[in-house]
Amino acid sequence: MRSIINILDLSAGEIDQLIAVADDIMAQPEKYNEVCRHKILATLFFEPSTRTRLSFESAMLSLGGQVIGFSGADSCSAVKGETIADTIEVVNGYADIIAMRHPKEGAPVVASMHTAVPLINAGDGGHFHPTQTLADLLTIHHEKGTFDNLTIGLCGDLKYGRTVHSLIAAMTRYKNVKFVLISPEELRLPQFVIDDYLEGSGLQYEECRSLEEAMPKLDILYMTRIQHERFTDDAEYQRLNGIYVLDKEKMSLAKSDMCVLHPLPRVNEISPEVDSDPRAKYFEQTRCGKFMRMALIMKLLGLIPNEVQPEKAEEPQYIYDKYRCDNRACISVCEPDVRSIFKTFDANGGACRCIYCDKERK
């Protein structure tokens, strides 16, 4: 059963197909309002969400389907100690497709091992958020008409910013893409993202501490909030919160056709005065998310012709039950019954990573 955990679980051709379907839905929504009749989507949201959960629900309802689910760990049996595996085994009998969000990294990987229906990662901690990236890509497609030859600034929380990690992964497929990474040292991009997606694909990138310095270079600015819920030290959060604020003055430094994106919610990192700037596209971005999720649901339920096939990725070697991950945000640490599995691409037994959270074993 196919699951979408990482944006790279979809090939570039499949993403192009989803964009074409999403554009057709936007142009002719009446064609699609019965295609998921008698189908049920389960939204398993163990972490708060506004846009992603409502977007998935609106997507399924607009396709003529039905929705069941919950919107917090305190409203399901997780609060009683039920494991992800058991939750998924139960929901298998109730739904045709699952969208799952969880605060722990790698939780959807565990879920995918137990699901009998297609499962979509709707965000796992500070790890990945592939369907937000689909929304980002449709917005970029509408605004720029291409994914090639773009300079993209990523600003704010790059360490825990799952949307940033997924967007970088997606852009490895395209030509002459450059990233400008704008963050404080404490919130710089995780090493696995640098190694796998930037260095691993040969993408150009530079690290920068100043938003003002970066602005004139950018075709796209992707702002993110500093995520209070990811910090274990409140004093560190208070020190870093508000370090980058996009306002009219900074917008005056940007190209006339630059595009500002944000996965939302925002706190104080984009001044409301920017909302009226025609380059601000973050609310359009949320609208795009619904249509890309509609297209993805249809694809996973076999309602779109399989004219484009997934790419065959290099298979790693797996190491079972030898190591334990030490990442406190990893699902394998939080649920001790989750089997320890590490992966390596080194035949000589070199560096290996947890399959759930991508943390490298030192």
Model-inferred region functions:
Residues 329-334, 361:
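Cys/His-rich microdomains that often coordinate metals
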Residues 320-323, 328, 352-355:
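Cys/His-enriched microdomains
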Residues 197-274, 279:
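Rossmann-like adenosine-cofactor binding region
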Residues 34-141, 268-271:
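Phosphate/diphosphate ligand-binding glycine-rich loop within oxidoreductases
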Residues 46-59, 142-223, 351-360:
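Glycine-rich phosphate/diphosphate-binding loop of Rossmann-like nucleotide-binding domains
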Residues 257-258, 263-308:
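Adenosine-phosphate binding glycine-rich loop
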Residues 1-54, 58:
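Positively charged, low-complexity intrinsically disordered leader regions
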Residues 338-352:
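Short linker/helix segments within small regulatory modules
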